[in-house]
């Protein structure tokens, strides 16, 4: 990664910090939208995985992983502020001295809160509409997450952050829509490795 790329990410960090300070509501709504996108991808991924779970579980995991990449694709192409991707962007900005660590922390906090609100709203709508049809879609999935030892959960979260940030970086660096699409899908399909995405766990 050359310094021009570092500067590009650092400038993005400065722009995010400026937006939080000058138009908090706009930034917060962008974070809420990212929460919506995460929920859409998570719900779709789990429903697709459940369809294959009994007959072809290996395909269920693979297709579910591909489907989950919809979240980062939507954020990259439509727009949104995802906490996980902001970890990389704001850290670059802070190390490059384009923003302070305090400013980075503010962006992290607002984006995390916005992601939580977005996930909560869409989850309530999903349950209220009875769209899941049955709790079986998520019962086993949630139980598996809760049974993972703390140490394993931590390292899976680190892996997740790496892969999501890689997808976000590809989305920023590549110019063609086809290239961005392909690299984001390949990067974010980390869910096949049972890594854990921060916002998705909300």
What are these regions (language model features)?
Residues 52-63, 151:
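Interfacial loop-to-helix junctions that mark the boundaries of transmembrane helices
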Residues 30, 34, 106-114, 118:
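Alpha-helical transmembrane segments of multi-pass membrane proteins
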Residues 191-198:
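Conserved small/polar residues in nucleotide/adenosyl-binding loops
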Residues 29-45:
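The first (N-terminal) embedded transmembrane alpha-helix
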Residues 162-186:
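A structural motif at transmembrane helix-loop-helix junctions in multipass membrane proteins
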């Amino acid at each position: 990664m050359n310094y021009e790329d570092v500067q590009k990410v650092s400038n993005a960090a400065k722009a995010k910090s400026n937006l939080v300070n000058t138009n908090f509501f706009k930034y917060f709504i962008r974070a809420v939208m990212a929460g919506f996108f995460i929920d859409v991808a998570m719900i779709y991924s789990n429903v697709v995985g459940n369809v294959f779970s009994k007959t072809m579980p290996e395909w269920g995991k693979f297709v579910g992983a591909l489907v989950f990449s919809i979240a980062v694709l939507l954020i990259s192409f439509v727009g949104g502020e995802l906490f996980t991707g902001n970890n990389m962007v704001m850290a670059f900005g802070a190390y490059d001295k384009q923003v302070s660590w305090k400013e980075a922390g503010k962006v992290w906090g607002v984006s995390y809160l916005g992601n939580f609100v977005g996930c909560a709203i869409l989850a309530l709508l999903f349950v209220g509409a009875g769209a899941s049809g049955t709790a079986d879609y998520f019962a086993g999935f949630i139980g598996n997450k809760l049974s993972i030892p703390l140490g394993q959960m931590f390292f899976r979260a680190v892996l997740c952050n790496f892969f999501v940030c890689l997808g976000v970086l590809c989305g920023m660096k590549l110019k063609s829509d086809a290239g961005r699409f392909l690299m984001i899908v390949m990067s974010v399909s980390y869910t096949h490795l049972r890594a854990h995405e921060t916002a998705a766990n909300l």
